[in-house]
Amino acid sequence: MRVFIISPQLTMKNTFYADEFNKEMVKQLRDYGVELYEINNKSIARCKLQIAEDSIIIVYNEHELEYEIFGEVQELLKKAIEKNAQIWPVAIDKKARIPIGVISDKQSYDVWEQLRCRDLDEQYIGIIAKIFARKIIARVFPTCYCEESEIFLSHRRIDGEDITAKIYDKMLVQAKELTPFRDVVNVKVGDAAQEVIDERMENSDVFIFIHTARSAESDWILKELRFALLRQIPVLWVQIDNADVNILKIKPSDQPHLKYTTEDFFDEEKLIKIVDTMLQTAFELIMDRSNQILGYVDLLEDLFGDKQEVVDKEKMIYRISVERKGYHYPQRNIEQYYQMFGRTPTLMDAQKLNMELNDTTADSIAILTNRIVSQSIRNNVVFDGIQDFYYHWNQYMAETQKGIKTMEIVISGAFPDSDEIFKQSLTDALILFAKAIISNGYELTFGAHPTFQELFYEIAKEISPQNYKEKVNMYISEWFLSNDSEKEAEYVDKFNLFKVDKKENLNQSLYEMRRRMIQRKEVKALVCLGGKVKENKKEEGIREEIELAQKMNIPVFVVGSVGGCSSEVALEYKNIGWRGLNNASLELNQKFLDGIDYFSMAQDMIKHISSDE
């Protein structure tokens, strides 16, 4: 879908604020890869020829027009109307709310009203431009972002209710199209409260975690964070009054995205800006997570090959026709449609997909996303996780064999020092690698990283509820247990626990734990992600673990795109042709260096190490 932006200079007298608005809008659209054309008096004729039915035309209103050039703009707009393109007028000033000429019946985007409801003046017009850009992005990339996104406000009532109420009320004013959820408001009298909360969590596009001092004590908060992270629903972490991050059992990232004091939320001017910042950051998180879906396009194309055809590229709808197995006599192919979503899909999406396809001969229609853990059928459409969809089709078509029980893959990782939004990429990578490893029959082995423990435990329970303990091996040095029998009992209940005797100091204890974890014949690969970069390279745990693996000829795979130490190590090995790291192809190592399709990386790695067995 193309977006055509008519320069304010062509339709307005005073363009100062319109230029500021336009500049920020264009920046946002370019940042997210929207195909756009800026129309000026030199390009207007050429652009008119390129307008198609699915185009969007942005035009700025003026209440008094005397420019000759406007006649050419009117001709362009007439052409757009003939092509059934969408025309979106923008009113910078309240006097210009009604467009002039052939589009006088169109509803304008009212910038003045957006500023008014925030009690802001034109100096803040860039904020409104970002909001308008989100509307365009929702239309251009409908499976990645939805203008009517649902926002789940996760908070502890005892010390977070007043703050959350302020946020909720202001969202209703500043983002009328969004649907925030606050349990005390949105759960009706007589409803089964937890059922409603669970349903709204499942339908959410983003969680906003209001981290107050008492949040860490709540099992409900822990449940909500687990729910979001396992379904790869983005979590915007908002820390209040420097609440202690170290006592959280599950952290969405290494550090909070935003930090405020309680008093900030009772200052009206600050509150308006806080909510806009939250909404913009939430949007960035949603888009960052949604963009990861693009990697699965190539993965499924490689899987199905000529058995797949594109139905609608922009809406990511595909049709597959695969020979049916397991019967002696001829029979028709399996016919299936699927649509891929980066955002959280809804029942309305299923209804639209059914209506658009209108094919009663298909065996099934599926909506695929990385937001789903368990398959369900709604509106006669199968809602399934992309990883599970790939895994089952791969098993069916290739009849691949799972790894045997004595085969392990070690995951090594720690949060790098980078922007908090992108630190969530490490959590995403950990989840996807863990799912791929366990689903393919390997055991997942790791050193007792406190944040990763809960993630790996929950993933193992989801995939193998009957024998999850056998799927995850956790190594820990006695240095960290300190005769804590309660903590040890918790670990034994969740994992295959291996305790390693502590040595004279912390560094020696860590080395011994890593050596015992890695240097075993059962270990078939080491995967390194993130890690802190230190002045003394010898203190970087990832480098020590790689050296231990190399001494046993264990292949090492280093993920570069999550940043941190693994990024530096990957570049170093690239410069020497990946020598000594593994015997995989240059292409696969390059994919680990700069790719973001972590599930595909994990599958390719498993294929490689399986072929070497």
Segments the model singles out, each with a brief description of its role:
Residues 14-19, 68-71, 100-101, 163-165, ...:
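A short acidic (Asp/Glu
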Residues 2-28, 64, 91-170, 241-404, ...:
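C-terminal interaction surface of TIR/SEFIR-family domains
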Residues 105-107, 197-201, 248, 252-258, ...:
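Short, hinge-like loop/turn segments at secondary-structure boundaries
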